[in-house]
């Protein structure tokens, strides 16, 4: 909760986005005013009539059914984490396991949405690898910075392109 998923969608899509934010009633878990309670959709206009459709879903476990549906229809996925949170690796491994269970797994990239040291990122990536999920790229991207998010999307598109060449 509060990693910046809605902010990232707004940064990428601007007004071409539908939000599912409501007033946060779980102030004990997080002090933010609003929280996401459903899937959010947006489009990035690439020009020339081409668009990329993106969606985001709440991270809380009580919304796992929403996340599982989104994962099942996705080609590529960003898992947004705060490397400073002690639970970030475990939560990421949980989502990676959900992805592994799908009939067709989307290409996956981890976004460190809060400042992290190179050592933290390398330790995190090694933890993912050691848990048996292979090499999952880990990039830093501020959810408020459209250019950083577009760079991360470029990496995801490259991964999708490589995947289609190898299949």
Annotate the PLM regions:
Residues 1-33, 42-45:
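Conserved G1/Walker A P-loop phosphate-binding module
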Residues 30-31, 53-58, 85-88:
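Short, flexible loop segments at the rims of nucleotide/cofactor-binding pockets, characterized by
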Residues 46-64:
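Switch II (G3) loop of P-loop NTPases
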Residues 81-134:
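Conserved C-terminal guanine-recognition region of P-loop GTPase G domains, centered on the G4
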Residues 49-52, 75-76, 105-108:
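Loop/turn-to-beta-strand initiation segments
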Residues 115-167:
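Canonical P-loop GTPase G-domain recognition
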Residues 62-85, 98-102:
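Inter-motif core of Ras-like GTPase G domains
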Residues 36, 58-63, 87-91, 120:
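Short secondary-structure boundary/capping elements
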């Amino acid at each position: 909760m509060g990693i910046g998923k809605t902010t990232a969608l707004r940064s990428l899509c601007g007004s071409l986005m539908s939000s599912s934010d409501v007033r946060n009633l779980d102030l004990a878990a997080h002090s933010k005013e609003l929280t996401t309670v459903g899937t959010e959709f947006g489009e990035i206009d690439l020009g020339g009539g081409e668009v990329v459709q993106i969606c985001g879903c709440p991270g809380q476990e009580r919304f796992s059914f929403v996340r599982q549906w989104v994962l099942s229809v996705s080609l590529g996925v960003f898992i947004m984490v705060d490397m400073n949170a002690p639970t970030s690796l475990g939560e990421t491994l949980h989502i990676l396991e959900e992805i592994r269970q799908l009939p067709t797994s989307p290409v996956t990239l981890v976004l460190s949405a809060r400042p992290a040291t190179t050592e933290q990122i390398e330790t995190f990536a090694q933890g993912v690898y050691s848990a048996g999920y292979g090499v999952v790229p880990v990039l830093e991207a501020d959810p408020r910075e459209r250019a950083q998010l577009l760079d991360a999307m470029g990496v995801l598109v490259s991964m999708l392109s490589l995947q289609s060449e190898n299949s």
